[in-house]
Amino acid sequence: MGGLVYFSSGSGNTARFVTRLGLPAGRIPISPRDEMPAPALPYVLICPTYADGMGRGAVPKQVIRFLNDPDRRALLRGVIATGNRNFGATYALAGRVISDKCNVPVLYRFELAGTDLDISRVQAGLAKFWGTECLTMA
């Protein structure tokens, strides 16, 4: 199975979701002074959305900084997005933005810290996703 990398702000919603998943994961730090995780294997990114009403700023700056590194970006295989449905069209927009920019699929979207059903679906979905992923280079 591949890895997980996530970003969670001070609210901790994404961190709570990842903890409930029960899978090892690297955390992108809030502070730019802290060291970024260095994935050694392909990974799925879990990312919250912070868009304004027009969709600007959907991807947190820390995540942009993380993905701007070519070695880290090369190992990205998919994205799981989170957001708040109160924001309508910008709900989980960070997932679509990352998907488009990095040419990876949006694997799932959930609201805030997710539900027990979201946890079950993501656990099963990741097991299936990594079961079909070829980890060797062609």
Curated annotation (Swiss-Prot):
GO terms for molecular function: FMN binding. It comes from the Bacteria. InterPro entries: Flavoprotein-like_sf, RNR_Ib_NrdI_bac, RNR_NrdI. GO terms for biological process: protein modification process. Belongs to the NrdI family. Probably involved in ribonucleotide reductase function. This is Protein NrdI.
